[in-house]
Curated annotation (Swiss-Prot):
GO (cellular component) term, any one: plasma membrane
Recorded topology in the membrane: Multi-pass membrane protein
Principal cellular location given in the protein's record: membrane
NCBIfam families: PRK11594.1
Compartments (UniProt record): Cell membrane
Keywords: Cell membrane, Membrane, Transmembrane, Transmembrane helix
Protein name per its UniProtKB record: Protein AaeX
Matches recorded under InterPro entries: DUF1656 (IPR012451)
Top-level taxon of the source organism: Bacteria
Chain segments annotated as transmembrane: 3-23, 43-63
HAMAP family hit by this protein: AaeX
Family affiliation: Belongs to the AaeX family.
Length: 67
């Protein structure tokens, strides 16, 4: 259960997890842009799977901050 209430914008109600998902997506884009020039994707077997796992880990860490 999150500490934040349901947010209503223009008659649409958004659960708190929606904003955590958006924030983790923004952090994911920043981390990904930082990792691409380092060449780490040359060592990754499946880049799409790596990106999905990275996003899931970031979302988990971010959601643990708001509990």
């Amino acid at each position: 259960m999150s500490l934040f209430p349901v947010i209503v914008i223009f008659g649409l109600s958004f659960p708190p997890i929606f904003f955590e998902l958006l924030l983790s997506l923004a952090i994911f884009w920043l981390v990904r842009r930082a990792l691409i020039p380092t060449g780490i994707y040359d060592f990754v077997w499946h880049p799409a799977l790596f990106n999905t796992a990275l996003y899931c880990c970031l979302f988990y860490l971010l959601s643990r901050l708001f509990v």
